[in-house]
């Protein structure tokens, strides 16, 4: 019987897709650690540089502490870090020696697996990042084939990329990453064999979102075609714009005759925990989605769509939404079909909005579009339309951005921030506002425990304590009395 493994995305991609990356803090994760470890997942999709920034900015949690404590609590389950390769928190491509230090610190603090996702599919960039990772530790490296629908992203395109990247001895495995949920069963039947034919005996995993209801079936079809692991979200962290829900995936795989490398009793306990967290924290659970054929055309994620709709409403132009959606497809074609993963969906749709409400197309252009055309995000997969490129670059702002400072060299940053800082603090200060890092350090260690049952009560008490007229708060029940007085903190 063929065994299929599972990769749990709840703490990183599930959290990001469903709750804007701000749903879960360190205490939520630490409380789940032993439950997750008991399940037997192949790996945990745990963090990224943007998630590390959210930990600092939003929760004042130290992301390095979070990583260390989670790794200690989960010694047999690799924690995964996903990266575009040569960037860390900041949008600019970093100095290679700076990234070497990033990869060294991540592995020293507990990362056991890296995903290299270059949205432009630049082979040299992926190979260089893999080399840096391997030179600084022993973590496994997985190359991402980021799926999208366009005239250039064919099966042959992905096979050629996998073959070229696979020449590097530093690439341990591959995965098909479908961040928008565009992969159909029919396309899986041609794409998976095309990739497997060129990667030799290296494993191939699948990561297919359920945004328009295709992720479950595409993943099950990929299982028939020889993939080694399927990425899933647990309980409320699955379905919706996240990944297929884990318990349903296990049931479907077993129904199809596969052995699933998971402890189902442990998975049930973990599911119950996340359900209680979602209820206590007001986090909407993912729900199975109906198929939406229009999404295959515009590929606009729900969060970006909502933001643009709100902007149009504020301008009194809500009736132009259909025009903006149509223009989004044209802008994407003009720019060489960038894959609609961060930051490109925001960039493309904002430009479409400018084109619709402006005097003419590309009369107003965002800095990010100019930088994209300059190649500051990497070389576009397909050339930018020549006339559009000329229009974008023939403006004063483009000339200003041509002289934009490069990311500083590691040695210069060391001189700027001092040579005595621990590497972990130095890396955060190099790319984040000082006041945010200061606030994180002042907050001290993160809580290690969390009780979903107590969370609503604590939230109510904090709200009451914040009211200026509330001088004393008393909660009583038989055999129990809690009194809070002005000046106390929660």
Question: What do these predicted ranges mean?
Answer:
Residues 6, 14, 36, 116, ...:
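Conserved, mostly hydrophobic/aromatic
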Residues 67-75, 127-137, 189-200, 250, ...:
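Surface-exposed amphipathic alpha-helices with a cationic face
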Residues 34, 43, 47-163, 180-184:
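Active-site beta->alpha loop and helix N-cap motifs at the rims of alpha/beta catalytic domains
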Residues 1-22, 74-91, 138-149, 193-203:
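N-terminal small/glycine-rich loop or linker at the start of catalytic domains
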Residues 153-163, 212-228:
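Catalytic cores of alpha/beta
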Residues 238-261:
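C-terminal helical cap(s) of enzyme catalytic domains, especially alpha/beta-barrels
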Residues 116, 178, 225-244:
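Glycine-rich phosphate-binding active-site loops on the catalytic face of alpha/beta enzymes
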Residues 37-38, 43-54, 288-295, 299, ...:
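Terminal or standalone catalytic/regulatory effector modules within metabolic enzymes
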């Amino acid at each position: 019987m063929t065994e299929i493994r599972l990769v749990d995305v709840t703490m990183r991609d599930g959290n990001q897709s469903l709750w804007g990356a701000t749903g879960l803090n360190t205490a939520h994760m630490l409380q789940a650690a032993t439950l997750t470890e008991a399940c037997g997942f192949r790996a945990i999709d745990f963090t990224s540089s943007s998630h590390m920034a959210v930990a600092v900015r939003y929760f004042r949690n130290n992301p390095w502490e979070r990583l260390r404590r989670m790794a200690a609590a989960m010694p047999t389950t690799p924690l995964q870090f996903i990266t575009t390769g040569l960037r860390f928190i900041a949008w600019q491509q970093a100095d290679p020696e700076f990234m070497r230090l990033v990869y060294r610190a991540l592995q020293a603090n507990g990362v056991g697996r890296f995903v290299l996702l270059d949205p432009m599919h630049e082979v040299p960039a992926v190979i260089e990042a893999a080399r840096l990772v391997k030179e600084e530790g022993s973590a496994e490296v997985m190359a991402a084939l980021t799926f999208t629908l366009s005239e250039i992203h064919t099966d042959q395109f992905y096979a050629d990329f996998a073959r070229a990247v696979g020449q590097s001895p530093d690439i341990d495995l591959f995965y098909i990453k479908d961040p928008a949920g565009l992969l159909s069963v029919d396309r899986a039947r041609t794409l998976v064999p095309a990739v497997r034919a060129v990667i030799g005996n290296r494993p191939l995993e699948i990561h297919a979102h359920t945004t328009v209801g295709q992720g479950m079936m595409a993943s099950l079809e990929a299982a028939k075609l020889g993939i080694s692991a399927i990425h899933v979200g647990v309980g409320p962290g699955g379905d919706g714009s996240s990944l297929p829900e884990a318990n349903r995936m296990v049931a479907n795989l077993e129904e199809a005759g596969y052995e699933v490398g998971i402890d189902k009793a442990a998975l049930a306990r973990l599911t119950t925990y996340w359900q209680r967290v979602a209820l206590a924290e007001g986090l909407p659970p993912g729900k199975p989605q109906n198929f939406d054929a229009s999404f295959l055309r515009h590929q606009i994620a729900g969060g970006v769509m909502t933001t643009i709709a709100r902007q149009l409403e504020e301008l009194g132009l809500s009736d132009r939404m259909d025009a903006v959606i149509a223009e989004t497809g044209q802008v994407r074609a003009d720019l060489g079909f960038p894959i609609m993963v961060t930051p490109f969906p925001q960039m493309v749709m904002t430009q479409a909005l400018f084109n619709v409400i402006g005097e003419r197309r590309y009369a107003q252009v965002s800095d990010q579009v100019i930088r994209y055309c300059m190649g500051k995000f990497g070389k576009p997969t397909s050339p930018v339309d020549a006339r559009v490129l000329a229009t974008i670059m023939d403006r004063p702002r483009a000339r200003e951005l041509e002289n934009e400072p490069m990311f500083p060299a590691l040695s210069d940053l060391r001189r700027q921030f001092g040579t005595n800082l621990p590497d972990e603090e130095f890396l955060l200060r190099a790319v984040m506002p000082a006041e945010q890092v200061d606030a994180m350090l002042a907050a001290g260690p993160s809580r290690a425990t969390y009780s979903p049952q107590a969370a609503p009560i604590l939230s109510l008490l904090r709200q009451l304590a914040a009211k200026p007229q509330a001088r004393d708060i008393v909660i009583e029940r038989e055999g129990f009395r809690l009194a809070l007085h002005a000046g106390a903190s929660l």
